[in-house]
Regions:
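An N-terminal structural lobe/cap that precedes and organizes the functional/catalytic core
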Residues: 2-106
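RAMP-family (Cas7-like) RNA-binding scaffold and associated basic/acidic loop-rich RNA-contact surfaces
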Residues: 86-178
Length: 178
């Protein structure tokens, strides 16, 4: 794998630069090369295995949502990353709190609508719908822009995630434990 220069990385911010960056990395199961891996199962399909037109079978090992659910809380727990985003704690009563970074639907979560943050959140979503400007959302919950948000119970504002991470295994065979 080659090392990227600072000039190359800075060039990505040019408006005529790339619209997406893709990193493909060869991963090996904990057991080593050729080891067996059991991916997650889903209620309606079991293993999420797709077959490409030429016959290659590809399985989802870790989904976009699952990856986001692990990345986002790091901004609350890693001392080096905490200063990068507002640390908003929502009071649940009886001395309990939850970080907005732990709310499953980010700024669009029901817990926000039942907190003192609800008016600010609504105003931020309405501003986005009216002007296309997401600055107010970024000030309240920048990870809502990074990992996506949908205010499904109120304004219906929906912002697509800008970071997608997924792990897939290629050329797989279906095995069972028995």
């Amino acid at each position: 794998m080659s090392t990227l220069s600072q000039d190359t990385i800075k060039s990505w911010t040019d408006p005529k630069g790339p619209v997406a960056l893709v990193l493909k990395e060869h991963l090996v199961p904990v057991e080593g090369e050729g080891g067996v891996l059991f991916p997650p199962t889903y209620a309606d399909v079991g293993y999420n295995i797709d077959e490409l037109s030429e016959g290659t079978k590809v399985v989802t090992v870790d989904s976009v949502g699952s990856q986001a659910n692990r990345m986002e809380p790091i901004f609350a727990t890693d001392p080096d990353l905490q200063p990068l985003v507002p640390q908003v704690a929502i009071d649940l009563g009886e001395g309990r709190q939850i970080s907005l970074l732990e709310a499953g639907h980010r700024l669009g979560d029901a817990i926000v609508r039942s907190s003192s943050l609800k008016d600010d959140a609504r105003s931020a979503f309405e501003s986005f719908l009216d002007t296309g400007d997401s600055t107010s959302i970024a000030k309240l919950a920048p990870t809502s822009l990074v990992f996506g948000v949908w205010d499904s119970r109120d304004t219906q504002a929906k912002l697509s995630r800008i970071v997608q991470s997924v792990i897939r295994a290629w050329d797989v065979d279906v095995l069972t434990r028995s």
